[in-house]
Curated annotation (Swiss-Prot):
Any Gene Ontology biological process: translation
Function: One of the primary rRNA binding proteins, it binds directly to 16S rRNA where it nucleates assembly of the head domain of the 30S subunit. Is located at the subunit interface close to the decoding center, probably blocks exit of the E-site tRNA.
Species in which this protein is naturally found: Haemophilus influenzae (strain ATCC 51907 / DSM 11121 / KW20 / Rd)
HAMAP family assigned: Ribosomal_uS7_B
Any GO MF annotation of the entry: tRNA binding
The protein's name: Small ribosomal subunit protein uS7
SUPFAM superfamilies, per the entry: Ribosomal protein S7
NCBIfam families per record: rpsG_bact (TIGR01029)
Length: 156
């Protein structure tokens, strides 16, 4: 633990097209090897496809999809007297967004469609309909937390 003041989080610049900090963060999650322009073209292409498919604004459709993937509780391992318990804890808002984005990207990369933009569009579309691999991941995490509710008093 540092003894000095805590470091404030860096301010992230909003994305150039929609002016959303959340979308800028998502572009950074998609980015591989520092190729931001490639990541931006993938995300914007996916959002265009998603907007045509749903008939909503691209940013609104993205936020609905992300909201359906965000976890509210997760389990953390806690060692008590020689045995390890999976203790359910509430997820902080920043981590909630980060996990949701990471799960969407992982699920999109595992899909078998042609381009990454198409895979991402399909995963976001599934997430906004409350189905798909990313939503399944959230359900699994919630199920684990529910199953280990008895150990909630070990919270720290």
């Amino acid at each position: 633990m540092p003894r000095r003041r805590s470091v404030e989080a860096r301010k992230i610049l909003p994305d150039p097209k929609f002016g959303s900090e959340l979308l800028a963060k998502f572009i950074n999650v998609i980015m591989v090897d520092g190729k931001k322009s490639v990541a931006e073209s993938i995300v914007y292409g996916a959002l265009e496809t998603l907007a045509q498919r749903t008939g909503k604004e691209p940013l609104e459709a993205f936020e609905v999809a992300l909201e359906n993937v965000r976890p509210t509780v997760e389990v953390k391992s806690r060692r008590v007297g020689g045995s390890t318990y999976q203790v359910p804890v509430e997820v902080r808002p920043v981590r909630r967004n980060a996990l949701g984005m990471r799960w969407i990207v992982e699920a999109a990369r595992k899909r078998g469609d042609k381009s990454m933009a198409l895979r991402l569009a399909n995963e976001l579309s599934d997430a906004s309909d409350n189905k798909g691999a990313a939503v399944k991941k959230r359900e699994d995490v919630h199920r684990m937390a529910e199953a280990n509710k008895a150990f909630a008093h070990y919270r720290w």
